[in-house]
């Protein structure tokens, strides 16, 4: 049995359209069910984030993403930023769900909020390329508007550094995945997230104001 049954139950609805039950006609009951699933999954994710944040009390929790977007499209891949020191415009940590109901997990990343960015956010973020990287940490880079995964190798670090200098890469995140669908215990998940944090702290520090 999954440790995160609400998330597992909600993931198959990725991309579905939600209609307000009062306007859904014959779909009223199914919309009420979707809303309940979304709210339960969001709470389950938020509770995990709170447990993680309690291990790092100096991090400030931002708000968990909603279970649907403004266009009322269901959005099960929740995320939650955790602000360290500095301004809200600067890179920080974030936890983000990924995967399908059959194989899902949470990634810890160093990134910034696009809606809060200023003229320095990108240059600070891309300092993550200044440090050597080691798997299982990896890069998630935005090239021509498309985000792509790059394994954590020196070869990829050099490649992305060159692409950044050439203006081909806009933004580079550093991420570390922790599986949830097959996790044996919550303690195991939190322990693996602590390993992820240990791996990513140097990259976070690299983004700080020099």
Please place each PLM-identified region on the residue numbering.
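Sparse, context-dependent recognition of short Cys/His-centered cofactor- or disulfide-binding micro-motifs
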Residues: 63-67, 78-82, 91, 157-163
